[in-house]
């Protein structure tokens, strides 16, 4: 069941779980995790979404009732681009959008612009990932649908950005509001529990992008239930 998700209609905050290329994050195991997210989303009326492998986009989009994002799209048109991820193919898959410029899949400025432009043409949402306040401020000028600030040194760590560098969230939100207050700012890196989520939202964030804290957990349902208490 392919779903649509509109920022203004369906509201915020949102938690986006990036399945990355973890052993637990693809195929049947990844699907089972997303099914847990779907159940929690419905039971507790919260916005949960997943960023998944390109290989799993069609299966997950067809069979889940949560928004599915790609982890990466290339800002290309039809043609000779072997190995690239075509925006039209992602749209066809049923995914609603994509991460752009994740710290583990960084892009140059020209490619970021091209990707956001192509996604806009096709109605795909973009979550532009940035590393710091200056990058977030610059990224806001491209008018992505969402910005997600993640200091790379904290990604996958035990200390949340909202604890280690709260000023990054606060100042990023302030910078974006001066350029386009309609762009929600998410945050990520080290987010593990409801206290991290609550602190992030108190600093002006409108959502969370996280990965290992959920995907690598032996009890993802328990972790997700805890996380949504912070929304």
What are the residue ranges of the model-derived segments?
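Conserved N-terminal beta1-alpha1 strand-loop-helix module at the mouth
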Residues: 2-85, 126, 134-137, 142-143, ...
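Conserved, mostly hydrophobic/aromatic
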Residues: 20, 53, 90, 150, ...
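Active-site-adjacent beta->alpha loops and helix N-cap segments on the catalytic face
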Residues: 26-33, 52-62, 78-88, 103-118, ...
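A structural motif corresponding to the C-terminal end of an alpha-helix
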Residues: 40-44, 94, 175-183
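General beta-strand structural signal in soluble alpha/beta enzymes
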Residues: 50-52, 68-70, 99-100, 128-129, ...
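Non-catalytic positions within long, well-ordered alpha-helices that form the structural scaffold/packing
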Residues: 83, 91-92, 120, 140, ...
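Glycine-rich phosphate-binding active-site loops on the catalytic face of alpha/beta enzymes
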Residues: 96-107, 146-159, 201-223
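Catalytic cores of alpha/beta
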Residues: 131-143, 187-206
């Amino acid at each position: 069941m392919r779903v649509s998700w509109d920022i203004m209609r369906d509201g915020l905050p949102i938690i986006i779980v990036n399945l990355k290329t973890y052993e637990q994050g693809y195929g049947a195991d990844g699907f089972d995790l997303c099914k847990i997210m779907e159940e929690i989303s419905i039971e507790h009326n919260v916005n949960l979404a997943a960023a998944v492998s390109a290989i799993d986009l069609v299966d997950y989009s067809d069979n889940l009732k949560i928004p599915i994002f790609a982890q990466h799209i290339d800002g290309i048109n039809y043609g000779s681009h072997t190995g690239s991820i075509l925006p039209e193919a992602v749209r066809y898959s049923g995914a609603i959008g994509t991460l752009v410029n994740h710290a583990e899949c960084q892009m140059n400025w020209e490619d970021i612009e091209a990707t956001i432009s192509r996604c806009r043409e096709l109605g795909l949402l973009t979550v532009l990932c940035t590393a710091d306040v200056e990058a977030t401020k610059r990224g806001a000028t491209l008018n992505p649908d969402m910005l997600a600030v993640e200091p790379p040194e904290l990604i996958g760590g035990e200390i949340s950005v909202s604890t280690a560098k709260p000023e990054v969230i606060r100042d990023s939100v302030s910078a974006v509001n001066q350029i386009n207050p309609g762009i929600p700012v998410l945050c990520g890196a080290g987010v593990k529990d409801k206290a991290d989520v609550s602190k992030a939202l108190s600093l002006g964030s409108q959502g969370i992008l996280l990965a290992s804290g959920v995907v690598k957990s032996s009890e993802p349902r328990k972790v997700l239930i805890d996380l949504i208490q912070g929304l």
